[in-house]
């Protein structure tokens, strides 16, 4: 009976407390305004009521009854707590959604769920990032090309050096027997014979010889192919060319007469006629065949006068030209040699270029590029031809008619040149006069003494009046002559 009485008291207390709590939630607006702190206070009240009820039950006398009542009270309190929690969840779900309260909440991605849901994918490594030889094919090609270029440079340079030394060894005895000095490099003030070639670069070698009668000196230039250049080697596979030996002999003015003459391949003569100043002015006709003198069809002749051709084409010269026609590119004798034509952007030069009496020879080395040191021996007879041409040019002289014709040709060329440059020379003279006047005016203006400045101005005015009077006198004389 006591236990039942205690149970009724607990129910009354719990009902009164819950009824007092739910009175605050009669209006829906109150529920919306209720925040988390209010619910925390509500939970504190529930805990206080639960703790007070068992304290009141402990005062009973029967231990067993007290234990039973206490357990039943705890079970009922737990059931009441669950019912209150369900009631609160239902009330919060029925509340209206406030956008301002949860602003920015939906924008935040759920990183934890996405990390767990994303599947693990294995990415294939690109081919160019794989650690294999195929990934370095470009580097391999570059290194291979660089090594090929270096090897070709070394081999080509050494071959040109061997060819040059082979040529010099073959011709050294002949050169030393005809010239006192062989191989002067020009580094010393006094001419000294070094007895070796002077290397200009990897494919050009020079040799200067002097100390012979009727000539100032002879410059020999060995112009080999650019074997050290890999690109040039590849280009020569499609268009073969030959090594060349160019010889320039500078004659003394008194040891060579006035004439222009050339013999060589037709292609070479056409090119020289366009490029060389003397051939374009004194040999304006097309190259003529040398069949009349027994020359092969591959060779042609350019000459200022027929007398020069007859004098130069003697038996020994024809012998050289006929037997070594495949090695001869051109032979050019001229007293008006000034080199290639001068191309100026602002027009013709104001004076004729300086000329020298020279003999020019261009020989092709046998082999068409595939040259060996032993092929240099085939050029030795051509050096004998050069020595013979020096003596031949010294002995040959024009007759009176030929000399007069040569002088007329040179006067004609000079006159044509002066006509072409007349306007330019007038402009140059006018600019010099204006510059002189400007300098005179500046000198007068810079004078500080007024009296001296006045005298200078009067002197300049008198000079101008005298020049004007001279011009008027010349005009009167011209009118009188015309009458």
UniProtKB/Swiss-Prot annotation:
What are the glycosylated positions?
178
Biased composition, class Acidic residues, residue ranges:
60-104
Q: What is its main location?
A: endoplasmic reticulum
**Cross-referenced Pfam families:** CCDC47 (PF07946)
Where's it found, cell-wise?
Answer: Endoplasmic reticulum membrane; Rough endoplasmic reticulum membrane
Q: Which residues form the signal peptide?
A: 1-20
* Bias (Basic residues): 473-483
Gene Ontology molecular function terms on file:
calcium ion binding; protein folding chaperone; ribosome binding
The molecule here is called PAT complex subunit CCDC47
List the source organism: Macaca fascicularis
Gene this chain is encoded by: CCDC47
């Amino acid at each position: 009976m006591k236990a039942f009485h205690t149970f009724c008291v607990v129910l009354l207390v719990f009902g009164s407390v819950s009824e007092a709590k739910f009175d605050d939630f009669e209006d829906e607006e109150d529920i919306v305004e209720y925040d988390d702190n209010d619910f925390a206070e509500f939970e504190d009240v529930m805990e206080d009521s639960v703790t007070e009820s068992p304290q009141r039950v402990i005062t009973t006398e029967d231990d067993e009854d007290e234990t039973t009542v206490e357990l039943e009270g705890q079970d009922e309190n737990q059931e009441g707590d669950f019912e209150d929690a369900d009631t609160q969840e239902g009330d919060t779900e029925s509340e209206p959604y406030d956008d301002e309260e949860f602003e920015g909440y939906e924008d935040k991605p759920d990183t934890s769920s996405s990390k767990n849901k994303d599947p693990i994918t294995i990415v294939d490594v690109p081919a160019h990032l794989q650690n294999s030889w195929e990934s370095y094919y470009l580097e391999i090609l570059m290194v291979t090309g660089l090594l090929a270029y270096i090897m070709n440079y070394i081999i080509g340079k050494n071959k040109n050096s061997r060819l040059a030394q082979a040529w010099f060894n073959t011709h050294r005895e002949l050169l030393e027997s005809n010239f006192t000095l062989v191989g002067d490099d020009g580094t010393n003030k006094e001419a000294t014979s070094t007895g070796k070639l002077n290397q200009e670069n990897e494919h050009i070698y020079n040799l200067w010889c002097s100390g012979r009668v009727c000539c100032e000196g002879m410059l020999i230039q060995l112009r080999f192919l650019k074997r050290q250049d890999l690109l040039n080697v590849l280009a020569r596979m499609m268009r073969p060319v030959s090594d060349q030996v160019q010889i320039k002999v500078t004659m003394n003015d008194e040891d060579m007469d006035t004439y222009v003459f050339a013999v060589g391949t037709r292609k070479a003569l056409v090119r020289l006629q366009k490029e060389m100043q003397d051939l374009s002015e004194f040999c304006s006709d097309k190259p003529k065949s040398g069949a009349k003198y027994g020359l092969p069809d591959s060779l042609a002749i350019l000459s200022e006068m027929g007398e020069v051709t007859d004098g130069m084409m003697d038996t020994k010269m024809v012998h050289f030209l006929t037997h070594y026609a495949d090695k001869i590119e051109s032979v050019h004798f001229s007293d008006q040699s000034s080199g290639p034509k001068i191309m100026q952007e602002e027009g013709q030069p104001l004076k004729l270029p300086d000329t020298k009496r020279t003999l020019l020879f261009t020989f092709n080395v046998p082999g068409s590029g595939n040259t060996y040191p032993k092929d240099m021996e085939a050029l030795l007879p051509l050096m004998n031809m050069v020595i013979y041409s020096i003596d031949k040019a010294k002995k040959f002289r024009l007759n009176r008619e030929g000399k007069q014709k040569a002088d007329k040709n040179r006067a004609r060329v000079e006159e044509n040149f002066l006509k072409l440059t007349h306007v330019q020379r007038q402009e140059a003279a006018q600019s010099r006069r204006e510059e002189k006047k400007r300098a005179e005016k500046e000198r007068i203006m810079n004078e500080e003494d007024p009296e001296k400045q006045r005298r200078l101005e009067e002197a300049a005015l008198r000079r101008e009046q005298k020049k004007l009077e001279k011009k008027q006198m010349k005009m009167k004389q011209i009118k009188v002559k015309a009458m």
